[in-house]
């Protein structure tokens, strides 16, 4: 007990000396997180021995010490990786390497030069939300190297370029739906740079067309410039209520006319189909009518039976019970190209992990050591992008491939995923 208290007191003294030194080099920050990790290890050990207090320090629960120790290990790994980069000689403070700064958006990146951006929802200065954005962002690449880029702000949100990809770490649209009513907002940087919507047809929140965000100019946070639209609240004059009403009436009439024509053609086809069915049944013909329509009089046509078949391709992907079925049986019926592709997707087992990019990288490092020889391949981190832009969609991904389903299930039982990482099953025809 006394020896444990003395060791804990010695750690506290080292931490106090480090805080008082005020050194701003990377080696000091790495040492700081090593001391914090050792502190949590001592607290964890003391709690497990039933010790509730070390000196004047209450001993926290085991789960608290465990989480803080893991955080210290993760930050230490990031700092040691950064120390091998060309940015190791830059000044680094305790705030810039703190857990709160690293876990703030963009997550698991080092950041410098915080600035406050104010967003006025509905153009109302009273309905304002402040956001913290960054002048410089240090992100880790898939090759475990570090790159330094400038942070930017536009009408959509705050972002930085990760290679050629435009990576938004803050988007104002989500909060506009929560705190606004019109779906529009103004972005104020340094009290004088303003970004406002430049179209008069910006749809309100909840409209199906609200996915298209109005184009706006962009500024770099390291050297903000005044937006040319600061003299006006909105980039263009909004359409007058009279013109809008006329346009809506005209569009409504056109839509109504199209619906009537479509309904008339559909009714005509149904009537023809019904007459053919009656003539066919009265003659005792065995041949089904050419057009069954919606009359329901004749036997099922080929198209109808296909659309209602339980094996329809449109029914979705592969059921869990069918996984690996293509290797065990031969198909008894021919199918379309999409069905063949779905049948082919039942082979080598994989696990798909989803989480923060750097969190997955740190986990991959530990996974390869702990599970060596128990898996086939593990991929680098990657992301999906949309069909019409290079913006990343969702969280980062990582794949782990196995030789067999048994090997995969055994790994799932043994692996411990970091907080914020989830997984799902997957199959590939080939690797």
Curated annotation (Swiss-Prot):
Residues 267-278 have a biased composition (Basic and acidic residues). Phosphorylated. One of its GO terms (biological process) is regulation of DNA replication. Pfam families: PPV_E2_C (PF00511), PPV_E2_N (PF00508). Residues 208-232 have a biased composition (Polar residues). GO terms for cellular component: host cell nucleus. Residues 1-201 are annotated as: Transactivation domain. GO terms for molecular function: DNA binding; DNA-binding transcription factor activity; nucleotide binding. Residues 195-205 have a biased composition (Low complexity). HAMAP family: PPV_E2. Binds DNA as homodimer. Interacts with protein E1; this interaction greatly increases E1 DNA-binding activity. Interacts with protein L1; this interaction enhances E2-dependent replication and transcription activation. Interacts with protein L2; this interaction inhibits E2 transcriptional activity but not DNA replication function E2. Interacts with protein E7; this interaction inhibits E7 oncogenic activity. Interacts with host TAF1; this interaction modulates E2-dependent transcriptional regulation. Interacts with host BRD4; this interaction mediates E2 transcriptional activation function. This is Regulatory protein E2. It comes from Human papillomavirus 23.
């Amino acid at each position: 007990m006394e020896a444990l208290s003395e060791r804990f007191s010695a750690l506290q003294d080292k931490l106090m000396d480090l805080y008082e030194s005020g050194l701003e080099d990377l080696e000091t920050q790495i040492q700081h997180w090593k001391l914090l990790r050792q502190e949590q290890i001592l607290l964890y050990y003391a709690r497990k021995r039933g010790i509730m207090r070390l000196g004047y320090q209450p001993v926290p629960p085991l789960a608290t010490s465990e989480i803080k120790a893991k955080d210290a290990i993760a930050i230490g790994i990031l700092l040691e990786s950064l120390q091998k980069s060309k940015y190791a000689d830059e000044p680094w403070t305790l705030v810039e390497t703190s857990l709160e700064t690293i876990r703030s958006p963009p997550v698991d990146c080092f950041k410098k030069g915080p600035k406050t951006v104010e967003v006025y929802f509905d153009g109302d200065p009273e309905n304002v939300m402040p956001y913290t954005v960054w002048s410089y962002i240090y992100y880790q690449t898939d090759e475990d190297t570090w790159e330094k880029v400038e942070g930017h702000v536009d009408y959509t949100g705050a972002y930085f370029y990760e290679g050629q990809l435009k990576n938004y770490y803050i988007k104002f649209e989500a909060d506009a739906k929560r705190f606004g009513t019109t779906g529009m907002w103004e972005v104020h940087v340094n009290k004088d740079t303003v970004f406002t919507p430049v179209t008069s047809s910006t749809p309100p929140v909840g409209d199906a067309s609200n996915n298209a965000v109005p184009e706006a100019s962009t500024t770099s946070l390291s050297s903000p410039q005044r937006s040319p639209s600061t003299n006006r609240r909105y980039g263009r004059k909004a359409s007058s209520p009279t013109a809008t009403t006329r346009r809506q009436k005209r569009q409504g009439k056109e839509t109504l006319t199209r619906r009537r024509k479509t309904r008339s053609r559909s009714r005509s086809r149904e009537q023809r189909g019904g007459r053919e069915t009656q003539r066919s049944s009265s003659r005792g013909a065995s041949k089904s009518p050419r057009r069954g329509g919606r009359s329901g009089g004749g036997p099922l046509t080929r198209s109808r039976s296909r659309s209602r078949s339980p094996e329809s391709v449109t029914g979705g992907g592969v059921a869990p019970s069918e996984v690996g079925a293509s290797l065990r049986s031969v198909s008894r019926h021919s199918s379309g190209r999409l069905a063949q592709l779905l049948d082919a997707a039942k082979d080598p087992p994989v696990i798909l992990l989803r989480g923060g990019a750097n969190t997955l990288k740190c986990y991959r490092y530990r996974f390869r050591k702990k599970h060596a020889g128990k898996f086939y391949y593990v991929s680098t981190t990657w992301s999906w992008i949309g069909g019409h832009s290079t913006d990343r969609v969702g969280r980062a991904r990582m794949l782990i491939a196995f030789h067999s389903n048994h090997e995969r299930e055994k790994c799932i039982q043994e692996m411990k995923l970091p907080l914020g990482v989830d997984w799902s099953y997957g199959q590939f025809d080939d690797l």
